[in-house]
Amino acid sequence: MKRRELILSAVAATGAGSGTNRVDALGLITPAPRYVPNAGTIYPFQARTDRIARLSVCTRPFRKQGPRIELEKIAGKNVVHNYGHGGSGWSLSWGSAMAVTSLVRTTNVREVAVVGCGALGLTAAVYMIRNGLKVKIYTRERAPDVRSFNASAGWTPASRVGTVEDCDPVRWEELCRNSFRMFQGLMGLPGDPLQWVDSYSLSDIPFDQAQAQRKADAAAAPVHFGTFDDRTKDLIPGNEDMAPGTHPFPTPYVQRTSQLIYNLPAYMSWLEHEFLINGGQIEYIDLQGPHDFGRIKETTIVNSTGYGARALMSDESIIPVRGQLGHLVPQHEISYALRYQNASLLPRHDELVVQRGTSDMDGYDNPSVAPDRAESEEVIQKLANIFARMTAPA
């Protein structure tokens, strides 16, 4: 028996790869699962546009200088700003919380207010309450209505976090490493709010050529986004080249690594529960301008309003970067991420996420939050083409 036949027979015997290609009502083919040595079974994505449960659009709060974490006197209050993290809000949330807490302690208070209940506000509140401070969150929205709930939810600490010319890489590295350390202490919690998954990158040309082209395009772009990942290469497993015949994908070049993802409904629920069970309070407020900080009784306030800070603070250093996600019905058997050209797939317990990403300039200075269904359908069709051409490993 040939090795190819032996693998498929073994998979069929266990039930992991049983079944044949299926054609759905829309005429799209879902191939049978494929077994990959040392990786388990690659279950195919049901790439169907009718599985879109919802679309979401979020405006990332990009600042050329990077996150604004600094103390300012406003309306008689000590206001510690904590916003402007671009596409790195979740990834840098714990490191930012530590930096914020250090500034809060310089004000010599025990009671602190946090404005905002998204990634940065909720995480800062949890960290401060764990460190002996009494914290109340003031917010207009809570999950699932905060912008942070619509993040793609992968570990992306350098995503549109600043420009090469203006962002401090040493400061970024400190935030990144502190966040990563905290995240590792949260692995294995009930419900898997955080988890590691295999991540596959597919390419039609050698990866070094693809990377050279991306660098050339980035250099020619009007905005030079910071690429600081080289400073923290030790945190994430490196890319592993997969030889032809060891994977089921149809492209000539495939790499595999590991990616940290956040299952946001479970993770945000855990953060809020952690905050409330330790004595935190949440109160509704709608602030229209900096003068409204005077309405808050606490004398030290952490301003974690994300993109909302652009209007609240009249801070035009915040530039919107539009990003759209397609949220699909979950496939719990899929436990890997995949990227091909400008299409990506990310697995979460609550859903599958698809996203278009041509370059860092995609969506730059675009404040529109109107969803474009055709954009997500295009991503699904591109992924459908990949999965329709899957083959069994040799």
Segments and roles (model prediction):
Residues E141-L175, R231-G238, P244-T246:
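Glycine-rich active-site loop/strand segments that organize a redox cofactor
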Residues T299-T305:
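Short hydrophobic core segments
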